[in-house]
Regions:
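N-terminal small-domain helix-loop-helix segment of the aminotransferase-like
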Residues: 2-102, 109, 276, 288-291, ...
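Helix C-cap/helix->beta junction micro-motif
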Residues: 27-30, 138, 198-199, 229, ...
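PLP-dependent enzyme catalytic core of the Aspartate aminotransferase-like
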Residues: 86, 161-162, 343-349, 353-362, ...
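Conserved PLP-anchoring active-site segment centered on the Schiff-base-forming lysine
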Residues: 113-135
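A short helix-loop-beta submotif of the ANL/AMP-binding
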Residues: 137-143
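Active-site phosphate-binding strand-loop segment of PLP-dependent enzymes
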Residues: 143, 148-219
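Conserved core segment of the aminotransferase class I/II
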Residues: 224-303, 313-314, 398
Length: 403
């Protein structure tokens, strides 16, 4: 008897760790060194967590062997609550904070608790593909609104408005954005929130990169602009504190919660079903949020992340036929390949061919639900010398590549 996967997974896709990665693993098993520019995982590139975070986790291990409250440790949730108080988010209490095994788990939970079959959720294109996958897995229908490359990758408000229907339940905002690195202006956020207000939409705001900002970029917390809207804000320690493997994230729920008691009960139920988040990692949250913010040293002038962002952007734009909007936040660049210079009809084939030829692993743009096969994403985490080598190989590859 053949055992098949569930029909629920028929349209679920997460190509950041998709079929091309399997080819990369096979090449590694054959002895090839693969430079992985496919995922924002700081630790393998030499970005280490602050010592005091590691020390506090170790110190608390003897008392972290049992379950915690399903929402998480009181001390960690209070630290998150105070974090949003400092960001001028109104009405967030201890019971409005849920800790999770990374933001990823919480995204899935929030969609499972909200959506019925056929409900629509507005998701940016390009997006972090887990949002699209989580909507689909919950029985919903992701509707992608365009972000405008010619306007620094800001969301196209007219496109959002045109795609709202009676079935639309929620609006997803990813700011700072992955894969583009865009950091949205207050004016753009206010425009998006006004559309949510007019159509009674729940707002999901993914802010995992809120501390990774370059040049004069300023992050505005979405919920601080909309005390009258139900807003779920997602964040965690993975990126800013370089502990992606700890799987430590949270949701903060703000706005008129009295109108959403049934939905919140659904989130409570799902939180209870998975018992609790990783308890040792919960002990990192209070120290991380309350301690010295070492991420600032990495993004200010002479900081390693800023230098690598600059180098990535300069080198990509130096390749004939390639253009890239300067990322103002996060850990990625999302360059465009001019189809007049190098026509690509299948971008998954492009990244596989690049892997086989140059031993570089990047991600095709369509993996981020971008509708055209003319972009790819690279991480800006490697050291400058490795970036020089990697992007030089991409340039040489494109000189002769044809589909």
């Amino acid at each position: 008897m053949q055992v098949s996967k569930s029909n629920k997974l028929a349209n679920v896709c997460y190509d950041i760790r998709g079929p091309v990665l399997k080819h990369a693993k096979r090449l590694e098993e054959e002895g090839h060194r693969i430079l992985k520019l496919n995922i924002g995982n700081p630790a393998p590139f030499g970005f280490e967590a602050p010592d005091e975070i590691l020390q506090d986790v170790i110190r608390n291990l003897p008392t972290a062997q049992g379950y915690s409250d399903s929402k998480g440790l009181f001390s960690a949730r209070k630290a998150v609550m105070q974090y949003y108080q400092q960001k001028q988010v109104e009405g967030v209490g201890i019971e409005d904070i849920y800790l999770g095994n990374g933001v990823s788990e919480l995204i899935v939970m929030s969609m499972q608790a909200l959506l019925n079959n056929g409900d629509e959720v507005l998701v940016p294109a390009p997006d972090y593909p887990l949002w699209t996958a989580a909507v689909t897995l919950a029985g919903g229908h992701p509707v992608h609104y365009l972000c405008d490359e010619g306007a620094d990758w800001f969301p196209d408000l007219a496109d959002i408005k045109a795609k709202i229907t009676p079935n639309t339940k929620a609006l997803v905002i990813i700011n700072p954005n992955t894969p583009t690195g865009a950091v949205y202006s207050k004016e753009v956020l206010l425009g998006m929130l006004e559309l949510a207000r007019q159509h009674n939409l729940v707002v999901f705001s993914d802010e995992i990169y809120d501390k990774i900002l370059y040049d004069d970029a300023v992050h505005v917390c979405t919920a601080s602009l909309a005390p009258d809207l139900l807003c779920l804000t997602f964040n965690g320690l993975s990126k800013s504190y370089r502990v992606a493997g700890f799987r430590s994230g949270w949701i903060a729920i703000s706005g008129p919660k009295h109108n959403a008691q049934s939905y919140i009960e659904g989130i409570d139920m799902l939180a209870n079903m998975r018992l609790c988040a990783n308890v040792p990692s919960q002990h990192a949250i209070q120290t991380a949020l309350g301690g010295y913010q070492s991420i600032n040293d990495l993004v200010l002038p002479q900081g390693r992340l800023l230098e690598q962002r600059n180098r990535t952007w300069e080198l990509l734009n130096a390749i004939p036929g390639v253009s890239c909007v300067k990322p103002m936040g996060a850990l990625y660049a999302f360059p465009r390949i001019d189809p007049k210079v190098c026509p690509i009809f299948n971008d998954e084939k492009f990244v596989l061919d690049l892997l086989l030829s140059e031993k570089l692993l990047v991600v095709q743009g369509t993996a981020f639900n971008w509708p055209w096969p003319d972009h790819f994403r690279v991480v800006t985490l490697p050291r400058v010398d490795d970036l020089d080598m990697a992007i030089g190989r991409i340039g040489n590859f494109l000189k002769s590549y044809r589909q």
